[in-house]
């Protein structure tokens, strides 16, 4: 049983965490037909293309600053209820612009949701601003500049997400230079859709502290050793990897092999309701599917706190809560 364990999440996309019940209420509020994407309280998709369509449709029902405050508060409340003490949320200021809300109002709403949730439960949260590969290097540089100039204490990291097959990591290295110079923590999606080479590219071009997913590194044992030697932390999302058919089943998933090879690994949920999972389920899977005992799971949570993009005082306080 892992329900009593303290939990930490480093890899979760905010819009991808939208609870179906809240999305349904939002759709009614705005008169948006979600019948193709939401049935019997669950999101519906059948392949990667329809997953993206469903994700975009869900995002349509969150339009205002208050909508984003409510979304953030609701998800963090869910996390707090399962003993989560810290969450990093991946957010896109570009998304705020695209929906006509604006980056500042979008981020302001999310920050208000964080404030409300913390007031109730004490849960800590930070924001990881992401650029999206499929919009090209200039867009990603813009996201990095936004994060660097925001002066927002809750924005503590920078990420690159989106279609992994769009260009090489080096095409986006300028954005990471901007974020690094601003003192932001660096993480990057790699080694999910694409193979081990994408993880090697990320290490060469970005030198990130963490990698989102990174599990395909297992296909190159020299790369696995490099990750272990560098201490690069992987934000592993097993339920997501199975749902998107990166691996056919948990028996073939490399989480345990990576950990046993000395790679620092952590557990996250990615886009939980879309993959019919949750952080609670991911922790349970660590025990049930991968055979980790509670001490090993606690060690992964400690790794997550040590790798969190927070100041020393917050890190010390989080470690004290384990």
Curated annotation (Swiss-Prot):
Cofactor names: Zn(2+)
Superkingdom assignment: Bacteria
UniProt-listed GO biological process terms: adenine catabolic process; hypoxanthine salvage; nucleotide metabolic process
The reaction(s) this protein catalyses: adenine + H2O + H(+) = hypoxanthine + NH4(+)
Any one Gene Ontology molecular-function term assigned to this protein's record: adenine deaminase activity
Site (Important for catalytic activity) location in chain: 213
Name of the top EC class for this enzyme: hydrolase
EC identifiers of the protein: 3.5.4.2
Pfam families: A_deaminase (PF00962)
Residues holding substrate: 271
Annotated Gene3D superfamilies: Metal-dependent hydrolases (3.20.20.140)
Keywords (A to Z) from UniProt: Hydrolase, Metal-binding, Nucleotide metabolism, Zinc
Record carries keyword Metal-binding: yes
SUPFAM superfamilies associated with the record: Metallo-dependent hydrolases
Residues annotated as binding Zn(2+): 11, 13, 189, 270
Active-site residue list: 192 (proton donor)
CC cofactor note: Binds 1 zinc ion per subunit.
Role of this protein: Catalyzes the hydrolytic deamination of adenine to hypoxanthine. Plays an important role in the purine salvage pathway and in nitrogen catabolism.
Family in the record: Belongs to the metallo-dependent hydrolases superfamily. Adenosine and AMP deaminases family. Adenine deaminase type 2 subfamily.
Family annotation (NCBIfam families): aden_deam (TIGR01430), PRK09358.1-3 (NF006848)
Protein name: Adenine deaminase
